[in-house]
Amino acid sequence: MAGLNSLEAVKRKIQALQQQADDAEDRAQGLQRELDGERERREKAEGDAAALNRRIQLLEEELDRAQEQLATALQNLEEAEKAADESERGMKVIENRAMKDEEKMEILEMQLKEAKHITDEADRKYEEVARKLVILEGELKRAEERAEVSELKCGDLEEELKNVTNNLKSLEAASEKYSEKEDKYEEEIKLLSDKLKEAETRAEFAERTVSKLEKTIDDLEEKLAQAKEENVGLHQTLDQTLNELNCI
């Protein structure tokens, strides 16, 4: 009777050990699956981090190109402003010359008025009219010649002033164009800088995620090793119990 009770106890112990072994095996398989899942997530996170790094590199290259274009546009704008300043100085010189010609014209008009006044006075004195008329005709002729020369000069000055004005308008249009390009490039650089900062933030987050996943995997690997050791111990105990049973 005592032998049967001992045998039953051994069987129950075997069953309990077998159940522990099965449970340990299930835990080990579960930990292995969890470890595989964590490895897959780590590989995916590493792939995302690599893609973000490539994206950051592309954004940096695009930012460099935009900065080079902006530098070129600023240089062209500076040259256009210098040309506009030179044209403005030239226009002031022409305006001064035109003012001098206008002064000469006023003097000629005064001389002409004086000649007319003398002519009016000559009407009252016939003899003086005849003598003074010859003088006045000569003076009037010379005055008309000077007036014609002044008119020709004024025409040339007006044409030159028109050309300078047209050139100045062209330079102003070019300056506005370069200013618009400069604003556009600055806006593009701002957008690229924002994208670069966002990509860097995402890359830092991905790197922290990879570190956490690596820590989780290390912990799971340690737990798996412990479970395997427990499983080996249970199998050894089970084998020892079976040997004892066979001896009985």
From Swiss-Prot:
The modification N6-acetyllysine is found at residues 177, 215. GO terms for biological process: platelet formation. SUPFAM superfamilies: Tropomyosin (SSF57997). Disulfide bonds: none annotated. Its main location: cytoplasm. Residues 2-248 form a coiled coil. It comes from the Eukaryota. Binds to actin filaments in muscle and non-muscle cells. Plays a central role, in association with the troponin complex, in the calcium dependent regulation of vertebrate striated muscle contraction. Smooth muscle contraction is regulated by interaction with caldesmon. In non-muscle cells is implicated in stabilizing cytoskeleton actin filaments. Binds calcium. Plays a role in platelet biogenesis. The molecule is in a coiled coil structure that is formed by 2 polypeptide chains. The sequence exhibits a prominent seven-residues periodicity. Belongs to the tropomyosin family. This is Tropomyosin alpha-4 chain. It comes from Mus musculus (Mouse).
